């Protein structure tokens, strides 16, 4: 079924159509992903490379994307509904496809990585302008320009160079291809020609250009090493995640990197172990303050994930081992902070407290930590009993208290559900 490219236009005879996006969820657990089955057809209707809308979804959702161009597979990590992605595609079309003047999708992108600009030209109304490059996708477009885009010196100059090369091989220059001499008033001075030739002679060697080329190489390398990383052992992948988080902290951007961290953990297929890495990098003796500061980071891993919550508790044990003198007496308070922040569930905490493990810390320290945690564990169990006891009180509705003249204390009798018309003989009580 096809839909209008510009879905704000309700005209059924609108000439610009595209297929409705089809999404298929594959995998389960940490490896769950959404494959956009007909992304090639959708992108063809929009006159854009299929990598652009896929990457746009990744930018908007904060998810990792994968491109298998050879097999036409375009993947967004995580589970996403087709309707949600279709609505998100409207945003991509509005920003990167529709003409700002006539709102028709007959546009071409003109990317100039050297000047870091993205131009937009419309074949319907003749509009020419520049795109706003503040969106994250623009960085990807600058590094991966469309094949039909005019890059660097442009197609004409490339064709000219190709012709020159062929002429040199043949040992002659075609007179039909020699352009007529320009008027005298338009002849450029010799030094201008030399400068232009120098620009074409070699690559741009400025520091900014070198940095861009290194970024392009690193992005390409990331794509090549994606499958290699998944072939590593779990321990090696956890170490990669540790280095990733540590680098974010050293660069001073850890506060806003929660989405990037969880995306990297999903890419490496070690999402459940993320809290173990985060505790080692982010927590020290000031852990109670840091729980509040980095709550969002941990919540992305621990929400509805009991396995991740258990790793968080193991990570807490490691932090206590490193700062035992300062933290051993504060165990109940730390657990309460994590519980109140919705990072831990009652069931997980109680299960953890019942068995000491020597996998992450010594057996003696693991037991001591659980002994120190007993006040909080007891409070959790009592609160659970009170909540279950409140339900039992509702079952006592059919009990009625009858006072006797001869007895000094009230007598409890059960009132039967079938009411009889016989009068109660008070003297017989």
Curated annotation (Swiss-Prot):
The modification Phosphoserine is found at residues 10, 227, 387-388, 408, 417. Keywords: Cytoplasm, GTP-binding, GTPase activation, Initiation factor, Isopeptide bond, Nucleotide-binding, Phosphoprotein, Protein biosynthesis, Ubl conjugation. SUPFAM superfamilies: ARM repeat, Translation initiation factor 2 beta, aIF2beta, N-terminal domain, Zinc-binding domain of translation initiation factor 2 beta. One of its GO terms (biological process) is formation of translation preinitiation complex. It is found in: Cytoplasm. Residues 194-207 have a biased composition (Acidic residues). Residues 178-187 have a biased composition (Pro residues). Residues 153-170 have a biased composition (Basic and acidic residues). Residues 143-216 are annotated as: Disordered. The modification Phosphothreonine is found at residue 225. CDD domains: W2_eIF5 (cd11561). One of its GO terms (cellular component) is synapse. It comes from the Eukaryota. The record marks 15 as: Arginine finger. GO terms for molecular function: eukaryotic initiation factor eIF2 binding; GDP-dissociation inhibitor activity; GTP binding; GTPase activator activity; translation initiation factor activity. Belongs to the eIF-2-beta/eIF-5 family. Component of the 43S pre-initiation complex (43S PIC), which is composed of the 40S ribosomal subunit, EIF1, eIF1A (EIF1AX), eIF3 complex, EIF5 and eIF2-GTP-initiator tRNA complex (eIF2 ternary complex). Interacts with eIF1A (EIF1AX) during scanning. Interacts through its C-terminal domain (CTD) with EIF1 or with eIF2-beta (EIF2S2) (mutually exclusive) through a common binding site. Interacts through its C-terminal domain (CTD) with the CTD of EIF5B. Interacts with FMR1 isoform 6; this interaction occurs in a RNA-dependent manner. This is Eukaryotic translation initiation factor 5. It comes from Rattus norvegicus. The gene is Eif5.
């Amino acid at each position: 079924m096809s839909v209008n490219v510009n879905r704000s236009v309700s005209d059924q005879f609108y000439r610009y159509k595209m297929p409705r996006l089809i999404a298929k969820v594959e995998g389960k657990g940490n490896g769950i992903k959404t494959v956009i089955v007909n992304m090639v057809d959708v992108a063809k209707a929009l006159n854009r490379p299929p990598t652009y809308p896929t990457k746009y979804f990744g930018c908007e959702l904060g998810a990792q994307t994968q491109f298998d161009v050879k097999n036409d597979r375009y993947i967004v990590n995580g589970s996403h509904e087709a309707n949600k992605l279709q609505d998100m595609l409207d945003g991509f079309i509005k920003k990167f496809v529709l003409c700002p003047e006539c709102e028709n999708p007959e546009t071409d992108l003109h990317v100039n990585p050297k000047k870091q600009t993205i131009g937009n030209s419309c074949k319907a109304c003749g509009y020419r302008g520049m795109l706003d490059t503040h969106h994250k996708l623009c960085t990807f477009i600058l590094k991966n320009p469309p094949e039909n885009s005019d890059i660097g010196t442009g197609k004409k100059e490339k064709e000219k160079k190709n012709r020159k090369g062929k002429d040199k091989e043949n040992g002659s220059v075609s007179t039909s291809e020699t352009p007529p001499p320009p008027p005298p008033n338009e002849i450029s001075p010799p030094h201008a020609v030399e400068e232009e030739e120098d620009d074409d002679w070699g690559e741009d060697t400025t520091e900014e250009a070198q940095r861009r080329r290194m970024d392009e190489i690193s992005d390409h390398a990331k794509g090549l090493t994606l499958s290699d990383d998944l072939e590593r052992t779990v321990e090696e992948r956890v170490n990669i995640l540790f280095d990733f988080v540590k680098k974010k902290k050293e660069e001073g951007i850890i506060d806003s990197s929660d989405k990037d961290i969880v995306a990297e953990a999903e890419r490496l297929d070690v999402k459940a172990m993320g809290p173990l890495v985060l505790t080692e990098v982010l927590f020290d003796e000031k852990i109670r303050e840091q729980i509040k500061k980095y709550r969002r980071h941990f919540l992305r891993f621990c929400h509805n994930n009991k396995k991740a919550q258990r790793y968080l508790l193991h990570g807490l044990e490691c932090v206590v081992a490193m700062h035992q003198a300062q933290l051993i007496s504060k165990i109940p308070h730390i657990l309460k902070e994590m519980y109140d922040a919705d990072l831990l569930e009652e069931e997980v905490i109680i299960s953890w407290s019942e068995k000491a493990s020597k996998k992450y810390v010594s057996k003696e320290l693991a037991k001591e930590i659980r002994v120190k945690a007993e006040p909080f564990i007891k409070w959790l169990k009592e609160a659970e009993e009170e909540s279950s006891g409140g339900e039992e009180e509702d079952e006592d509705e059919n009990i009625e208290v009858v006072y006797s003249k001869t007895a000094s204390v009230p007598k409890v009798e059960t009132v039967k559900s079938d009411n009889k018309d016989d009068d109660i003989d008070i003297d017989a009580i």
